[in-house]
Structure formats: C-alpha cells, structure tokens
Amino acid sequence: MAQRAVWLISHEPGTPLCGTVRFSRRYPTVEKRARVFNGASYVPVPEDGPFLKALLFELRLLDDDKDFVESRDSCSRINKTSIYGLLIGGEELWPVVAFLKNDMIYACVPLVEQTLSPRPPLISVSGVSQGFEFLFGIQDFLYSGQKNDSELNTKLSQLPDLLLQACPFGTLLDANLQNSLDNTNFASVTQPQKQPAWKTGTYKGKPQVSISITEKVKSMQYDKQGIADTWQVVGTVTCKCDLEGIMPNVTISLSLPTNGSPLQDILVHPCVTSLDSAILTSSSIDAMDDSAFSGPYKFPFTPPLESFNLCFYTSQVPVPPILGFYQMKEEEVQLRITINLKLHESVKNNFEFCEAHIPFYNRGPITHLEYKTSFGQLEVFREKSLLIWIIGQKFPKSMEISLSGTVTFGAKSHEKQPFDPICTGETAYLKLHFRILDYTLTGCYADQHSVQVFASGKPKISAHRKLISSDYYIWNSKAPAPVTYGSLLL
Amino acid sequence: MGPLSRDAWAQRLGAFRASPSAFMAGPEGEDLGRDLLSDLRSEKLSEQTKVSLLALSMEYPAQLWPDASAAEVAATSLLDTLVLLPPRPSALRRPLLLAATTALAAGGALGPTSGASCRLLPLLLGLAAGSDLGRGFVPASEQRPLQATACECLRELESCKPGLLGGSLGLLRGLLGQEGPVQPLSLLLALALRNTLVLQSRVGAGLGGLLTDKVSPTGGGPWDWTLVEEGDGRLQPQAPSWPAAEEGEGERSLTAREHSPEEARELRAAVIQLLDTSYLLTPVAQAQLLWLLGWALRGLQGQPPALFKPQLVRLLGTAQLTLLHAMLALKAAFGEALFTAQDEALLLRRLTLAAQHPALPPPTHLFYLHCVLSFPENWPLGPEGEEAAPLLLGPQLCRGLLPSLLHDPMALLARLHLLCLLCAEEEEEEKGQLPSPRHYLEELLAGLRQRAALDGGPRALATLCFQASYLVACCLAGQPTVLTPLIHGLAQLYQARPMLAPHFVDLLDQVDSELREPLKVVLRQVVVSRPGRDEALCWHLQMLAKVADGDAQSATLNFLQAAAAHCTNWDLQQGLLRVCRALLRAGVRGGLVDLLQVLARQLEDPDGRDHARLYYILLAHLAAPKLGVALGPSLAAPALASSLVAENQGFVAALMVQEAPALVRLSLGSHRVKGPLPVLKLQPEALEPIYSLELRFRVEGQLYAPLEAVHVPCLCPGRPARPLLLPLQPRCPAPARLDVHALYTTSTGLTCHAHLPPLFVNFADLFLPFPQPPEGAGLGFFEELWDSCLPEGAESRVWCPLGPQGLEGLVSRHLEPFVVVAQPPTSYCVAIHLPPDSKLLLRLEAALADGVPVALRTDDWAVLPLAGDYLRGLAAAV
C-alpha cells in the first residue's frame, strides 16, 4: 500500500504542451519494490515530460481531437474509473490514478504488489484508494481558502516539505496536509501520550463549538405527462470545536420538527465513535413510509482541531421549494418563452438572493427582446445569449410570478456563443439560483441545548443554517428533455 | 571546486528535475552526487537549501548513486553528516535519516555486510525506542518527531526486506504499550508482525517468544537477517486475500499452521492491542492497519476474525474511501466468518449508497461503482475476476445508479455497464412497477446518438456514443430486442453525419459478427442508396471499403460508377480503388470488370489509373481464390506499415513466384523399353499438399532435345501418386544430367519455385530394342547387323565379370529385352538400338565361372568407351 510517484499538472489549453508539471514527487524505495513485485510486467515511472504528454492524451486534454485516433477514440477503449493505463514508449504504465479539478490534474501511480499480467482487479489493489485519498488531500490543501494564483503558488511551494511529513516514503500517513503543516510549525510542542495522530496539538482558549448546517436542493422539473419531477436535499453538517484537553468528547444531536423530512444516506466523519443502527440503515433506496426514523440523530465524536464535516445526509422533502414551468416555442425567426414560478407556502420567503438564469445555447447573440414580467427585473447578456431574471429577496404575496416574451437571435458564431450537446433545437432549461439564510428545507436543526460536551469549561455553542440551490433545473415542457431513470417512476 | 551558492544549487536542481536523464548525460551529471554530499556539510548553505538537496536525493538516488557501493558510500556520508550536526535543534536530522534510509534501501546496499546498514539500524531502533543516545545527539524538542521518523524509516526497511524486524516484535509491542507515538509504532508493529507470520509459516516455524521477548536495542541487535534470507528477498503482497489476485501463486497461502496456545494468546493480545488504539490513527493509517492485520490473520487457526467487528461497526458509517476499501478487503479475506448474510447486505447497501452520494466527488463514485460490480460476495455465483452485479443488488437498489445523458462520459459508461447487466437479467426478473430497463437503455442510446450527430460537436461525444454501443453489443449479445434498434439507430446516425465513418469502421472491427454482419448490410444500403456525389463522398467510400461484399453488387457498382465521375483528387480516387479492391476480394467479377476498365482510362491521376489497370489485370487473369490471397492482408508486412506498402508487399507475396525449399521429391523408376523413344519413369512424392505442380527439366550440354514439362494437378503426402513418364529425345547416345525445377501452388495460395536435386540419365536408360525379327530369322538378322558395323564403326572385346548368378542371371536382369539369339546358358547375341540412330551389338559366348568374354561392335565409335564401362559395371550393379 504505497505510491510510486505523484504529480500535479496544470491544464493550460491553447499552449503548445497544453499543460505544465507544477509538482512531482517520486518514491524510489517503492519503485524498487514495484520492480520486484511486477517482475516481467514492470514498467518504470517515466520522467515528467513523457508522463505529461501521455496523460493529457489519455484524458483528451490535448487541443487536437480533429482526427480519429484509434489509441484514443476506439470504441473498445472504455474507462469506467479515474484509473488509466498510459502508453509511454511502447509500454503501458498502469494503474495511473488521475482526475481533473479546477484546471489542475492530480495524478499518482499506486504500487501493485503482484504481477500486472494479467491485470489484477482494481478492487484488490490497496494503493488505489490510498492514491485517491492522497490526491484529494492535496486538492483540499491547495484550494481550502485559496483565492488567487499567488496563494496557489505559495501552497505549491509548501508541498515538498509537507509531503516529507505526510508521505515521506510513499505510504500516506495523513491525508490532511494541513495537519502536517501545523505539525511542522509546532514541532516543539511536547505531545503527551495517546495523542491521536489526526490531532497535532491541543487547543488553549475559550471553549466554543460551532455547528453549521448547509442544505443544497437540486431539482429537475419537466411539467410533463409521464415524467415525474424530481428533487433532493443534500445536507452537510460542519463543525469547529475549540475545546481544551486531548480527547474531549462531544455529542451533537440533529433534530427535526414534527413535520420534518427524515434524514437519509447519512455518512459520518471517521471521528464519530458510534452510530445508531437506525442512522446507518436509513436510506433513500428504500421506499419511504411513516415508520422512517426521524431522529434525533445523535453523533458522539472526538473532534479534531480543524473545522470538519461531521456528516452528510440526503432527504426527500414532500414538495420542491419552487415549482415552475418553462415553455419555449420556436416561431419563425424568434423564440416565444413563458415562465411561471411558484414558491411553496411552507418555505421561508426571505431570500438572500433569487435568480433564474435562462441560457440559449447553440444560437447567435440576442438581437431583440420583448418581454413582460409580473415581478423582478430582467438582465440581458446579448453576447452570451443569456437572460437573468432577478427575483430579489421576496416573492410577492401571491407567491407566484411569471415572465413571458419573445427573443430574436443573430447569426451564430462558434467562438462566442456557448455550445451545448443537450440543448439543441427546442430542448432548453432555466436554472434557479437562490439562497435562504437561517433555514433548512428538511427543518433539520442542531439544538444548542442538546449538544453535550465532556470537557473542562462550559463552551459557547453557536449554530447556523442555510439553504442554497444547486442544479435546480426547469426544462422546456414543449420539447424533449434528458430524463433520469428516477423520473420514469410514476 | 568550492561549495555552490544557494542560487547556483537552485538552478542546478531545477535543470536536473526538468530532465534527470538529460542532466546526468551532460557535463555536470557525474559530479552531482558527490557535490551534493559534500555541500551538505558546507557552512555557507542554509538549512533550507540543504533540505532541498536531501529531498532530491530522496527522489533520485538511483541517478545520483547508481550502484550498491556508491549507495553505501552515500549513506555513510549522510550518517557522518548527521553525527556531526551540532547539538542544537536542526531541520536536517529528519531528512538526513530519511535520505540515508532511502539511499540504502533503493540502492540495494542494505544487508548484514554493509557498514552503513550496521550503523543506521541500531540508530533507528534506538531513536524509535526513545533511548538516550548520549552526547546530546537528539535535542529534547526533536525527540518526539525523530522517534516517529525512525519508526517510518524502519517500516520502509522492513517493507523492502521483509522479516528484518522479526526479532524486534516484543520490543515494539512494549513501546506501543508505553508512551511511544501510537501511529508510527502501530503501523511498524503490524507490518513486522504480518511479515514474520508469513515467513515463519513458510519455514514451518512458530512465533516462539518473539512477541514477548524484549531485546535490548543496544545489545547485539535484534536484526534477523536469517529470516530475511529465508524470505529469499521475496516481497509479500499485501492483497493476496483477494481471491482473483491469488490465482497462479499456489504456495502463497498461510498454511493453516497451528500456534501453541501460548503463542496464539500472545498473537491475539497483540492484534487486540493494535485494534483497540486504532481510532487514534488517521483514517488512511487505520485502513493500512486493517489491510495488514487482515492479511496477517487470514488462515490462522484459533484467531477468529470477529476481533475486527468492533472496528467495522465504528467505520461502516463513514464514506472514507480507504476505510471502506479496507473493509472490502476484510470481507474478501474472511467472507462469512466475519460478515453474516445481513452484514453483507448492509455493506453492499452502504457501498451502493456511497457510489451515488451527492456529497462525494465523482472519482469516488466511480471507484465505489467498480467495487459494487466486483463485490466480494460470501457465495459468489459468476466467474471470478469479471465484473458482475452481485446477487443482492436488485433493480430497486440500482435505481439511483443508472445512467443519464447528463452524466460525464466515464460515469455514463460505468453506469451503462450496470444497466446492461440489469437488462441481461431482466427476463428472469418479475415485471414489477419499475419501468423497463431495456426501454430506458434504448432511449439513452438514442440520446447519445443524437448528440453524436450534432454538426460541429466535439469528437468526444461521438466517441462516447460508439463506446456505449460497443459496451451494449458486448454485454447484450444474443438479445435481438436490443441489437435491432441499435443497428437501426446507428444507420440513422451515419445518415446524419457521414464524417463519423472512421468510428463505424472501428466499431465493425471490434464487435462480434452478431452485430457486425447485420450492421454491415444496413450501412451498405445507406451508402449505396445515395447519389454518390455529395461532399461526404470520401466518408462513403471509406465506409463502403469496409462494408462492401458480394451481396447487392449492382447497387454498389452503380454507386461507384456514379461516384467515379466525382473522384477528382488523389484521395477520393484512392478511396474508390479501395472499394474496388474490397469487391475484388469478395469475389465480385461481372460489372467490376467494366468499372475497372473505365477507371483505368478515366481517372485523372496516373497512380490511380495504374492501380485500376492492375486490378483489372488481376481480375482478368487470376482465379477467385488466388485473387483473394493476392489482395488479402499481407503476412509479410508489419502491421503498422502504411496501406500502400502493405498492398505492395501483399502483391509481391501473392503474385510473384517465391523461391522456396522443395516440398516435392522425385525418384527415378525403372525405364520403359517400348516405343520409339527411351522414356524415364519418375516417382513424385510431396511433403505438404501442393497443387498445379509443374516439373521442368533442362539437359546439361544439349545432349538431348529440350524436354517437355510435366504437370501434376495435385499431390498430397501419404497418397500414392501415379508415376510420371518423361520421354527423352537424345541427340547423341550419351548419359546426361537433368536439372529439375518445380513450380507449384501451396494450400495458402502462394506460388513457389524450388530447385530439386538433379536426375542422372544412365547409358542403359537410352537402350531400345530392335524390332523383333521373324521366328528363326534371329541369327541371320543379327549377323547382318554385326557385319554392317564395319568398316565405319568400331570393334572391341571386353571381359565382363560375372557374379554368383552366372551369365544367365546377368542377361535376364539387364539385357533380356535386347536378346536376339539365345543359347542358354552359354551364348547370347544382343542387339541394342541407341537413339537417335546408333547400334550396339554384343556377343556373349563361352562363359567361364567368373566372367564372360564379350565381343562388341558399334557403328558409333563414341559409344565404345560407354559400352565398355557399362559391361564392366554390370556385375557390380546387380
């Protein structure tokens, strides 16, 4: 269970190489083991240059995909995981764990402790999950709180020293690189015994516990016979516990109001020490019934120093917060659109913001627009072929608003207007963006009185909640729309 | 050279990292390793720079110190540098330990005879034990971090030399129980324990007191090089618990060796000790611990895997990739012994849930989905090593894992695979209220094709569509309800976007005939029904070259005829000719002749005309099987050569006559003495089946008239062939050598040419009898001949030795057909006609026991020496 090498590569489309190796680290002792384990099937880790080229080709990130290239485009080359075989100098380097996120490619080569011919199943290679965790750890470190390029460069320059702590020999010791940074900074602190490895020091100061619940709601609405609208809530509970002592114990309970929607698919942080079996088994896979466990959801844990995600959950609320329809028809040279949105009465009518984005793909710039709206203002981005309906902080008393109008487009030019493979012809969507503070759709809240802390001093407990939209689509009901299998379940 | 400045080093390291091989090949390469070691002691360089030098040495020791002795020297130097550090806190101690360990382990210098190893190992163990190493070697503030580092170094050495720390198990256990740093010690102990158990079981030994003996690290040292040697340097895989990974390594399993009750108790206590404190480890370290202990305990009697249960209950709620993966490893290792049927169902549910949980990143989803399809079931039904839906994974559970057009390509393909597996099982499933997966699959594929058909869309969309079609064709072969609409849809896609022709050709190459054949038919119909002059002509021709065959000839030829007028450039003409070639191969003749003739006249490009003419000639002259071979893929050309080269090579192989070793043997039978000419009887024999054999003979020295070739339609080994008759037309009565050439076709259709060993025509082979004189007139006839020889001819007397068979035997064996007058057993008169018009007359009279005097006359004096030799050789020739 070790990594032979790790790379960070920035993806730079339009440049000659289409990318630059920003960081790489090799582990020669692991490489030596790979040579013994893999035997005749051993393929050495290449230098950065060839690796970069082969990886970008495999990930289809080179600019040139004009022609059919069999080694890339053949129908039988099917990758179903983020684990690749790279052709380098006539040999295939496998397995290479790699993914692209925010224009940065994260890649590593886990050690396989046996021959590679025939290829062992991925699930049997312990280094694969470790490789993912390693790359996720680096990604979290680079992008936590990072705002601009110079901060990114600073963090990249810290990586060599951090990996000397977190992964000195290719076997990952801690995926949380921030821990290693703190460890380097506070190396002189004498650690008492039984200090957890995931907690590099102890907190000194006023005890406080902060709990914030963020719910994201996503939805696909079709307004069609035979296709069900779908929506889902995904919650994240984040905690920051500033408590004295090596191993303070905390229990947080999440509660629901009487008509709240049960939490399902709960995943917890590894610091949670035990879980009620009702929490473990409550799942969205099963059909819902009244007997579903509805809390309180108790999470006993020993907190790490940093802010962490105590748990994730999903929930199926009975109605979507905003129900709408979108009708778009092509009429000779123009499009006629009609939009209707209705806020459900049970939802808190106090938004931080609420907007409907109405994009028109695969068309030219907007040249003419006539519209009528019952509420809010419309902003027009002619070159981007985009309308934004700014609804504001509150829906009107009727809770229902509408927009109708006609749009005319100029000639299409490929560079400026967005291409979309799905929104062709009259297939189109509008996407809602909104945020409501101090509110959750499930009703889920962390009762401050139910937070139990077994540590010296009475901590100050603060709790926050918010609801935000994410992938909230309303499809044109007058044209075909992509459906999920779930939408066919009527 | 003095020490380099910080900037000079930064520049040098940058140049090295850009391309280590290029740097090492350059002028500075040789000195880099030496300079690095010496500058580590320079007082002018900052610690930060020195750390970067050490970091480099940790990454590229093989380049800096390419052999074991150089690595040994480097490790010694690094240790010296460590010892020489002033007794104050320094950022160098940790990296120096790491670098020395790396140099020894990666350089292959680690061993009982290595001085550096014998210094490093006690130092590391001393640091790990937190013992006082004297002289302020370790400042108090660094003690704790160095203790952890020493454990990491020891773990790496143990990884590279399994069994090295077998003697230190007791010590490590003791340290873990006291105040040592939990994570490094736990991982080190678990690894050493695993390796020791594996090695001990292999040599049939027990743990003995290893887990309890506390060796003093300052003593002789607990290094167990013997155990390392017994391990034969062979590294132990961590994941053999996986059934599929285990195949082919028979002697791997830990033979269920029984430990003594004492040993078993200690082992159990050690494992429990490790597991109980595992919550103090980081999640990734916990996962490692579980993998190691799972492997250590697998197959050990008396060690119930239930020890793991408390940890599993704690971890089942997390979605940490490494932890869930480790749990699956335990599942694979212990099966039902650790996971009851209910546990199994719960684990699969958690896994299914994690594979779609919106809070997790897409790469995690994909890996979990792979884990679902490779789930180590307690009672697996299907073949091992193949992805399949576990039995417990019903349609209800999969609902959220099905693909939609909104997924990215990888997620779509992974989920599509699952959907295909569901469709394959659908027939057995009861039709519930769920919508039909097969119908959903059809819709999805239609959506993918629609996107691929978008004008100007990226190639990735097309590739995805064809990958999906291929996946479906593989998983659902034999399901016409799926394949029929797929074929129909693909044909429509081609109609919409002919530029996808290369993808179609690739798909046809990859899929089984079940999809390929009907798809070919449909695509051919789509192409030939077009007018043959649109802008996509080059794609149509590419497609047609793949799908054209003997069926629907006239439509295809009509299309080509129409297209020919529009093939104005080289590319198109080549495309057109490729289709002709495909038709030629498929055995199309009729209309193709006309087309090729037209092309040979009409095409603008001379190369095109030449090719058309060549194809025409081939078509006109070669039989269908030969044509197939001539145009078939060439065996001679390597696969990557261009098609033109391949074509030429193919022609060379197929149309030229190949020099080959002789596959046929000829032997000379007894000659026939009838008719006006001497005739040789040849017996052919084949080593392999050969066809259309033509034997050509050439007479050396033009002694005979040129010989006709002999033809044999077919020869097979083991099947007796009729003898071949070769009439000779001598120009003078003399023996001769015949050169023999064979020309034949092999069963693969190649025409070969071979030299056979020469045949020798003997003097006697030319003998012909004179016409038989009337009864009783023999003597007169003979005397007349005898007298006619002189005076132009020659006369001689020869002693012909006789063998045991006597004169009678000799005559009956060799001269019987030529005897004119016989008075057995003493006197014979022999008259031989030698074509073209010579005669040889022999009187054999008054034979003695050992010989007979022969009086001979001939009208051709040149025959005399030949006759003499012949007679003298007769006795020996018996």
Curated annotation (Swiss-Prot), chain A:
It is found in: Cytoplasm, Cytosol; Late endosome membrane; Lysosome membrane. The keyword Membrane applies. It is a peripheral membrane protein. Residues 206-476 form the MHD domain. GO terms for cellular component: AP-5 adaptor complex; AP-type membrane coat adaptor complex; cytosol; late endosome; late endosome membrane; lysosomal membrane; lysosome; membrane. As part of AP-5, a probable fifth adaptor protein complex it may be involved in endosomal transport. According to PubMed:18395520, it may play a role in cell death. Belongs to the adaptor complexes medium subunit family. This is AP-5 complex subunit mu-1. It comes from Homo sapiens (Human). The lineage of its organism: Eukaryota, Metazoa, Chordata, Craniata, Vertebrata.
Swiss-Prot record, chain B:
Residues 250-260 have a biased composition (Basic and acidic residues). The keyword Protein transport applies. Keywords: Protein transport, Transport. Pfam families: AP5B1_barrel, AP5B1_C, AP5B1_middle, AP5B1_N. GO terms for biological process: endosomal transport; protein transport; vesicle-mediated transport. One of its GO terms (cellular component) is AP-type membrane coat adaptor complex. Coiled coil: none annotated. Residues 234-260 are annotated as: Disordered. Probably part of the adaptor protein complex 5 (AP-5), a tetramer composed of AP5B1, AP5M1, AP5S1 and AP5Z1. Interacts with ZFYVE26 and SPG11. As part of AP-5, a probable fifth adaptor protein complex it may be involved in endosomal transport. PANTHER family: AP-5 COMPLEX SUBUNIT BETA-1 (PTHR34033:SF1). This is AP-5 complex subunit beta-1. It comes from Homo sapiens. The gene is AP5B1.
